[in-house]
Curated annotation (Swiss-Prot):
This is Phosphate acyltransferase. Its EC number is 2.3.1.274. One of its GO terms (cellular component) is cytoplasm. SUPFAM superfamilies: Isocitrate/Isopropylmalate dehydrogenase-like. The lineage of its organism: Bacteria, Bacillati, Bacillota, Bacilli, Bacillales. It is found in: Cytoplasm. It holds the Pfam family FA_synthesis. It comes from Listeria innocua serovar 6a (strain ATCC BAA-680 / CLIP 11262). Homodimer. Probably interacts with PlsY. Catalyzes the reversible formation of acyl-phosphate (acyl-PO(4)) from acyl-[acyl-carrier-protein] (acyl-ACP). This enzyme utilizes acyl-ACP as fatty acyl donor, but not acyl-CoA.
């Protein structure tokens, strides 16, 4: 199994990318890594080249580059070359911690969309109070969506939850402003109707945002605009809560003593709420596994993302989506980009 990795994407590239790669190849003897990026900078950190091949390029996509323009103009960028390796059959999947929009564009324009899937979807696994987590999509690949798109998102998320997260018959829910079938706008009402009347996956109805982290669903479906807002809200709320808790525990002698006893528990709580522990965000709907690692990923974050991609390839997630897509076909599908 060969995995193409963009060594130059992310806040801590290439050091943390390279360290994560070395940890992964040491753990999994069945993988080879193709590292795309500046060979000199990569070699500063690559102390073990076992099953690691460097493909040199000076070009990279910056975090502030306009995604589509960058992908079309920077043909030799590390991210683009990694995707091209997948397209050419030289790698089975690709990973980048770089520009999210550029990676989505690369997945669509270079690797290509699955026939029958109208729109791709970005899907991370988010934390729950039980530590189980849930898959949520779309979190930003499409600002707007149609009911048939959300229907397909449910299928893709369900396949991933079953194959990679090992959940038998995953519970798929639709994010809405109420649990009743009649609640919501035109998009959610029509999506509910389509999802209720299919048998490709287990649809359990609407879910409200306040219940997202309560482990009531394994897959939650929404449009990309709403999903991205929810993700940022969860991130912001979590950070604010931990900050307030820290200030309270450090305010006064008694609180500081209590904090010393609670330190281990608080660190475990912080780790439980860190969704990078589940790996990266999958770009579903393209012809091969494409995963966006968190931009601030350290070596362990890259390692968990490689582990995640390895599972996706091994469990044939993309192939399963391709074989199942006709079960959620509504009328004609849009022409592939």
């Amino acid at each position: 199994m060969k995995i193409a990795v963009d060594a130059m994407g992310g806040d801590h590239a290439p050091k943390e990318i390279v360290l994560g790669v070395m940890k992964a190849v040491a753990q999994y003897k069945d993988i080879e890594i193709l590292l795309f990026g500046d060979e000199t900078k990569i070699n500063e950190h690559l102390t073990d080249k076992t099953r690691v091949k460097i493909i040199h390029t000076d070009e990279k996509i910056e975090s502030d580059d306009e995604p589509v323009r960058a992908v079309k103009r920077k043909k030799k960028a590390s991210m683009v070359l990694a995707a091209q390796a997948v397209k050419d059959g030289e790698a089975d999947a690709c990973i980048s911690a770089g520009n999210t929009g550029a990676l989505m564009s690369t997945g669509l324009f270079v690797i290509g969309r699955i026939k029958g899937i109208d729109r791709p979807a970005l899907a991370p696994t988010l934390p729950t109070v039980t530590g189980k987590g849930f898959v949520m999509l779309d979190l930003g690949a499409n600002a707007e969506a149609k009911p048939e798109h959300l229907l397909q998102f449910g299928l893709m998320g369900s396949v991933y939850a079953e194959k990679v997260r090992k959940i038998e018959r995953p519970r798929v829910a639709l994010l809405n402003i109420g649990t009743e079938e009649t609640k919501g706008n035109e998009l959610t009402k029509k999506s509910f109707e389509l999802m209720k009347n299919q048998d490709a996956y287990e649809f359990i109805g609407n879910i409200e945002a306040r219940d997202l982290l309560m482990d009531v669903a394994d897959v939650v479906v929404t449009d990309g605009f709403t999903g991205n807002m929810v993700l940022k809200s969860i991130e912001g709320t979590g950070a604010a809560f931990l900050s307030m808790l820290k200030m309270s525990l450090l305010n006064g002698f008694k609180n500081k003593v209590a904090a010393s006893f609670l330190k281990k528990d608080l660190m475990e709580l912080k780790a439980k709420m860190d969704y990078s522990e589940y790996g990266g965000a999958c770009l579903f709907g393209v012809q091969a596994p494409v995963v966006k690692a968190h931009g601030s990923s350290n070596a362990n974050g890259i390692f968990t993302t490689i582990r995640q991609v390895r599972e996706m390839v091994e469990k044939q997630v993309v192939e399963t989506i391709k074989s199942e897509v006709d079960k959620v076909k509504v009328g004609g599908t849009e022409t592939n980009d």
